[in-house]
UniProtKB/Swiss-Prot annotation, chain B:
InterPro entries: QTRTD1, Queuine_tRNA-ribosyltrfase, TGT-like_sf, tRNA_ribo_trans-like. Belongs to the queuine tRNA-ribosyltransferase family. QTRT2 subfamily. Heterodimer of a catalytic subunit and an accessory subunit. It comes from the Eukaryota. This is Queuine tRNA-ribosyltransferase accessory subunit 2. Residues 263-282 are annotated as: Disordered. Binds 1 zinc ion per subunit.
Length: 389, 369
């Protein structure tokens, strides 16, 4: 039996965009969906209640962080991450591999797994596919990810092919190790770098494993956007229609709109909360850097159409005056930025369902780039799915 | 705006039970004001503050936290007053000139001005500068400008502090007299005197002759002021203040006073001296302290305080808060502050209820146990 049921609610008659209902053990998720990242069982100063109030149905937890601290034993005693942080809706955990490779200098990848130096002691530790699944089983997220062999998206040559094949071998080990099939969904990950042939081969192999959902990995690492969209487009065209597609690490507004047009269902990114910490507010016409003195006498809210607590309560001038001294400023901006992401995804979904998505995309792009100076990759990507800017 | 007070005689000590009314709002006393910096209660977004019941409808903002940012120009440009600017639209603010956040840098104060310390350094403020600033803030209450000295200041310096503070008070009153826009802002006189009984009494007696709304008792949050001195000085000071006016003490719950004894001592302060308002915020629980950093909370899935009705205790465990604190996660501060404020507000509510019901002795036993 599966812990996930998938329903295709609507498809755009022009592009590849789709609206789905993904029913998970803890909560149904309406897609396209953005999942905010709560690294250590907390979303940068926001309570789980506040995330619920914004309307999120699923959030992301990091296995690397939760697995080292507080650790899987405590997670088990706490009856999983849901109870530990008192989040009643759905959670997705990553495999922990990417965090190690990106955060730790000493990470080394072998066939066995990812070898790394413990940040808390002198020990060398090994994250195997089996160990990653074991930890994720103790965290208890609704969706868990296979350990994959991540290489920088700008890497070329035989290492990319090796990583792709190893990712498939590791997937098989993850499937064998997974204990909670009835309540946790293991997603596989498409790798293969920027090489279309490798991506094709990878999709072919992993689709055979019939996992409840499929992620597109190895992108969003500073690669050329023209190649980025082509890889996404290829994957969504090859992947089965009846399963959720999760594009890892993507969260800029334009990327979300374009990739939704290409048929992606799920996204995650630290960007909205990270940029909030630096004093930046996301708005439909770009962003406001509220530290700048131009906002010191600006008595409008960040976005007068935004329904969030911050916009209903405060002016830009007020935020400008507290931004350098009070952590509350960053909570307020996180609330706004996450509300912005949530609203954007809701609009995408609503327009797909009403079959007005192409017009929505045009309006969105027009507001974001009022001078019509659209990024070429977005123009090309959208044209490939019949949306002409 | 008015203040109704009832003095309750409890075996020789005079407790005061009162209600400060302004508009449709009431602050019951003894009570605490909640402190904010630049308009924010540290760590708390307004939705979280809203989870607390009985939050006094007036927010305390010290001058030092707003004089630079937002500052006069921004507030004047905004034009609707500080309460509205800081998103506290339905309620009001109290502006204090004294900054009890750290030891007063009193040696920098001068005959014509005091020095206010901000992030970028020192700003000299005269009574007129201050009054002008208060005018654009439109608070419900404000305190007169004061030259606060610690308990160990010399006799000469302490005398000067009392003289200057009275002079500043008179200038604040004169400005208020001339400016109608300040008529709806009530002025509280600062009572000084450091550690000297004579000076405390002189300051109280002189201030009491001025047309002020209430009195603030300054210098009791100083590092040099130990608990014994506080209890000696307070009754000798307050006996010189008119019964029918409210009294506010800043920073009485300073972290320098041992917190466990503090809670019971605080009740003594209330009982013996009948101060009407106290003001404090602290990262730790009020009555007995939990250090959430300690390893023993690692697997403790109980609430901070069992039976506590606050948002935090209803939703989160010690283990989770411990995890947040040891990882320096911002949410740790949010949750602790929320619980502590709830406890603090509840503490004062218990005091008032026990006074109303004549159960004071029982309540004290509970805290002393
Ligand atoms: Zn907003
Ligand atoms: Zn509590």
């Amino acid at each position: 039996s599966r812990a996930l049921s998938f329903k295709l609610v609507a498809e755009c008659s022009t592009s590849k965009a789709r609206a789905c209902l993904i029913t998970l053990p803890k909560c149904s998720v309406e897609s396209p969906v953005f999942m905010p990242v709560g690294t250590k069982g907390t979303m940068k100063g926001l309570t789980s209640k506040q995330l619920e109030d914004i309307g999120f149905q699923i959030i992301l937890g990091n296995t690397y962080h939760l697995g080292t601290n507080p650790g899987p034993e405590l997670m088990e005693k706490a009856n999983g991450l849901h109870d530990f942080m008192n989040w009643k809706r759905s959670i997705l955990t990553d495999s922990g591999g990417y965090q190690m490779v990106s955060l730790l200098d000493l990470a080394e990848i072998t066939e066995e797994g990812v070898k790394f130096a413990s940040p808390y002691s002198d020990d060398m530790l090994l994250l195997t596919p089996e160990r990653s699944i074991e930890i994720q089983n103790s965290i208890g997220a609704d969706i868990i990810m296979q350990l994959d062999d991540v290489v920088a998206s700008t890497t070329e040559g035989p290492r990319v092919e090796e990583a792709m094949h190893r990712t498939i071998r590791w997937l098989d080990r993850c499937i064998t190790a997974h204990k909670n099939m009835h309540c946790q969904n293991l997603f596989c990950i498409v790798q293969g770098g920027l090489d279309m042939d490798l991506r094709r081969k990878c999709v072919e192999e992993i689709v055979k494993r019939d996992t409840p959902g499929i992620a597109i990995g190895g992108l969003s690492g500073g690669e050329d956007k023209q190649v980025f969209w082509k890889v996404v487009d290829l994957c969504t065209s090859l992947l089965p229609k009846n399963k959720p597609r999760y594009l890892m690490g993507v969260g800029y507004a334009v990327d979300l709109v374009v990739c939704s047009a290409l048929g992606v269902d799920m996204y995650d990114c630290v960007y909205p909360t990270r940029t909030a910490r630096f004093g930046t507010a996301l708005v439909p016409w770009g962003q406001l850097r509220l530290k700048q003195s131009q906002y010191s006498m600006d008595f409008d809210p960040i976005d007068k159409n935004c329904p969030c607590l911050t916009c209903k309560t405060y002016t830009r001038a007020y935020l400008n005056s507290i931004i350098k001294q009070e952590t509350v400023a960053c909570h307020l901006l996180s609330i706004h930025n996450l509300t912005y992401q949530k609203q954007l995804m809701e609009s995408i979904r609503k327009n797909i369902i009403q079959n007005t998505f192409p017009q929505f995309v045009k309006d969105f792009m027009k507001e974001m780039f009022p001078d019509g100076n659209y990024p070429q990759w977005a123009v090309d990507a959208l044209a490939s799915v019949n949306i002409q800017l | 705006m008015n203040f109704k007070v009832r003095v309750i005689d409890l075996a020789g000590s005079c407790c005061r039970l009162g209600a400060l009314q302004f508009g449709t709002k009431v602050v019951e006393t003894p009570g605490c004001l909640i402190y904010n910096r630049s308009g924010v209660v540290p760590h708390l977004t307004p939705d979280i503050l809203e989870t607390l019941d009985n939050v006094p409808p007036i927010m305390h903002t010290p001058l030092a936290s707003i004089i630079e940012e937002p500052g006069l120009i921004k507030l004047r440009g905004y034009g609707k007053g500080l309460a509205s600017f800081i998103g506290y639209k339905d309620n009001s603010v109290y502006i204090s000139a004294s900054d009890y956040q750290g030891e007063a840098m009193y040696q920098y104060n001068e005959n014509k001005s005091i020095s206010v310390w901000t992030k970028t350094g020192r700003t000299k403020v005269t009574p007129d500068d201050y009054s002008k600033f208060v005018e654009v803030c439109r608070p419900s209450w404000y305190q007169s400008l004061c030259d606060t000295v610690p308990a160990n200041a010399s006799i000469k310096r302490t005398r000067k502090s009392v003289d200057r503070t009275l002079e500043f008070l008179d200038q604040c009153l004169k400005y208020r007299e001339k400016h109608d826009s300040l008529k709806t802002s009530e002025l509280w006189a600062a009572v000084e005197g450091g550690g000297l009984v004579d000076e405390r009494q002189r300051s109280a007696k002189e201030s009491a002759t001025r047309p002020v709304f209430g009195f603030t008792l300054e210098g009791f949050g100083s590092d040099q002021m130990n608990v014994e001195t506080i209890f000696e000085l307070l009754p000798l000071t307050t006996q010189n203040l008119p019964v029918e006016k409210p009294r506010l003490i800043h920073a009485i719950g300073s972290p320098t006073i041992n917190s466990l004894s503090r809670s019971s001592k605080l009740t003594e302060v209330e009982e013996e001296n009948g101060n009407d308002s106290s003001n404090d915020q602290d990262r730790t629980a009020t009555f007995s302290l939990l250090n959430l950093r300690e390893d023993r909370y690692n697997e403790d899935f109980s609430p901070l305080v069992s039976g506590c009705k606050c948002f935090v205790c209803s939703n989160h465990t010690r283990a989770y808060i411990h995890h947040l604190i040891i990882n320096n996660e911002m949410l740790g501060g949010v949750l602790l502050m929320t619980h502590n404020l709830f406890q603090y507000i509840e503490f004062f509510r218990c005091i008032r209820t026990s006074l109303k019901n004549n159960k004071w002795k029982e309540l004290r036993k509970l805290f002393d146990a």
